[in-house]
């Protein structure tokens, strides 16, 4: 296939979503450059792969490139995008570049408010177990390969579809997975109906020979079904699901469940990932594998050897009888799900949480939901809001959130104005046998790492 080797520049190349696409393009032989405000493990990796990395955003960084790729976090007034437009260089969203990559192969896109990253990683492992060697682009680092992207030699590509700004509608996947729909990204969507409409458009973009894979246990996903006029399959715990998990049990960090397809028993899975949410993620992956003719024995083997995803209920270490975990969860639903999984895994231990709210807009739109999301934590330390490029909103801060948490009945809430003060509070609060988990999409994981280092 003819493919001109364009020069492609990424603004914010160190982001987890941008870097995966950049890595794939480098491996395909394209000339890739990018800028970010700080150096990181990600930018260092891309530089070693041959990328040209600039620290800071400057107009001259885009000189000579053919296209500029931006994420939704990049502001309109960014000097690089402004310079590109002045020069007539196309400026496109990340999702459009990903959609172009997906056009080259048989594509599987995983969308949903929660569980996208883990489900994408499991689908990739399932297809690999079937000998399909897929290309993978994911919003988190796969522990098995140490990266968020992999160039496969097979005819399939598996990618995470980000609904946050509606740009996932640029994709036209052959298989579209919807894990769930929730009230999220309200800075972009005006209400829940608009969110559901976006997902309805997403599943409608599959070709006539394609397939939608839908979680029947998510009520907003159920609302899509009457409007779908192409082939679809459902999964869940309910008996109405085409692919059903039954007899679910948990023991420590392990889950077990029986898989039935159209009422026929396929087998029992032992999953080395905790939580009911990972049972759902696995069901979606099984559905994709079966559609692509991966034998169930291969699917089972893949699921039972999963190594997980960085920052998804990841055990960071143990010290002095204390287990330290980390999770990316930053939405009330994710927080409740994660804490349920931790309590199921460690039913006789105290659970302590260090939470860093992510974005002022999210904290504002889901404020009361956040205030009622931590009942399964024995104690809670709340850090200042991680802005993620947003400007502060008056009255929206972690002090107000702590007051609301206490007002809703949480007995042990501590406000920590810095990571250093959070560590000081933990020294006074944590005791042997506790499970300590850092929660949030920012850099809260550093508190857990510092805690482990201070006690080693």
Curated annotation (Swiss-Prot):
Organism ancestry: Bacteria, Pseudomonadati, Thermodesulfobacteriota, Desulfobacteria, Desulfobacterales
Gene3D superfamilies associated with the record: Mur ligase, C-terminal domain (3.90.190.20), Mur-like, catalytic domain (3.40.1190.10), NAD(P)-binding Rossmann-like Domain (3.40.50.720)
Protein name per its UniProtKB record: UDP-N-acetylmuramate--L-alanine ligase
Family: Belongs to the MurCDEF family.
Keywords: ATP-binding, Cell cycle, Cell division, Cell shape, Cell wall biogenesis/degradation, Cytoplasm, Ligase, Nucleotide-binding, Peptidoglycan synthesis
Gene: murC
Main location: cytoplasm
Family matches, as PANTHER family: UDP-N-ACETYLMURAMATE--L-ALANINE LIGASE, UDP-N-ACETYLMURAMATE--L-ALANINE LIGASE-RELATED
Compartment list: Cytoplasm
Database matches in SUPFAM superfamilies: MurCD N-terminal domain, MurD-like peptide ligases, catalytic domain, MurD-like peptide ligases, peptide-binding domain
EC number: 6.3.2.8
Protein's UniProt keywords contain Transmembrane helix: no
